[in-house]
């Protein structure tokens, strides 16, 4: 199991919670239930992604899980629109530990929390001990939000967990990118593949940024997309991706990466690139190293609830 530290939580309470969120997020809140979580995003008026999240319905409250540094940004953003709604937003602190688990490898631990594991993408289970959410993708991952880590002794679990680098790489290999404060309001959902990953419901009503996001979707194919590339070399903080196609050369930022120190495995990165033809080539550039070749990989997203 992996300890996930790069996360924060916001709780939204009050009689208008669902109606309020429906006008602020890209997913359809009507599809949120005690057994089904939602993945989505909050956007600004220009259609740029402020934050992404997982939503869980816990009783009458909605719990929003996001990246470190984003909870206060989300609270501040949503509070601006909550003036005329009966809702309260607060930073959630009750989850003392968040774990990443594999459904098969960690089944013995997981069944101590619940007899019935979430099976489908975004299925969830809520108990007095923890919240379990099945992460979309082919690798059968679950997030476990623990209320009280003192129960570890009762469950026969030690406190020595793997670091989250491996978990982050699984996200990268699936083509999932999460918004940090550095990426907030920089990119459209389409450029981040959020439409392909099921984070945008095009059949729901209006929400902040919806008009621009829908126009981009119905206008036709995207010119740029989040892309997965593999490297035999280590990726650095200042690394950039060089894309060459004929006489055209473009430079793109590395949005997130995970290095491998095992010779049998490649390092991996995500970057927003021009839609490539078969003739395009890619390389990694940094201020201190020579260019290194990159291999473009195809991405296949799980089919969730993408409205047409």
Where are these regions (language model features)?
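Basic, glycine/lysine-rich polyanion-binding surfaces/domains
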Residues: 1-308
């Amino acid at each position: 199991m992996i300890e996930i530290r790069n996360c924060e939580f916001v709780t939204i309470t009050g009689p208008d919670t669902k109606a309020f969120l429906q006008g602020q997020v890209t997913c359809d809140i009507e599809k949120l239930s005690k057994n089904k979580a939602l993945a989505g995003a909050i956007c600004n008026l220009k259609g740029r992604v402020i934050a992404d999240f997982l939503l869980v319905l816990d009783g009458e409250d909605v719990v929003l899980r996001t990246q470190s540094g984003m909870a206060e940004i989300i609270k501040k953003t949503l509070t601006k629109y909550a003036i005329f709604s009966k809702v309260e937003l607060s930073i959630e602190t009750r989850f003392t530990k968040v774990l990443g688990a594999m459904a098969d490898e960690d089944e013995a631990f997981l069944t101590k929390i619940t007899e019935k594991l979430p099976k489908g993408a975004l299925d969830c289970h809520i108990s007095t001990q923890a919240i379990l959410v099945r992460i979309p993708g082919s690798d059968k991952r679950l997030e476990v939000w623990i209320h009280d880590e003192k129960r570890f002794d009762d469950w026969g679990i030690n406190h020595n967990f793997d670091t989250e680098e491996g978990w982050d790489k699984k996200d990268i290999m699936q083509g999932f990118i999460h918004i940090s404060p550095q990426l907030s309001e920089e990119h459209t959902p389409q450029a981040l593949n959020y439409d392909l990953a099921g984070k945008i419901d095009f059949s729901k009503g209006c929400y902040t940024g919806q008009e621009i996001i829908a126009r981009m979707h119905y206008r036709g194919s995207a010119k740029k997309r989040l892309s997965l590339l593999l490297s035999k070399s280590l990726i650095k903080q200042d690394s950039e991706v060089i894309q060459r196609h004929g006489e055209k050369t473009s430079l793109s930022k590395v949005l997130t990466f995970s290095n491998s120190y095992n010779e049998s495995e490649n390092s991996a990165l995500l970057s927003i690139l021009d839609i490539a033809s078969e003739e395009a080539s890619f390389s990694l550039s940094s201020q201190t190293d020579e260019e290194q070749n990159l291999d473009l990989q195809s991405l296949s997203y799980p089919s969730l609830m993408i409205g047409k």
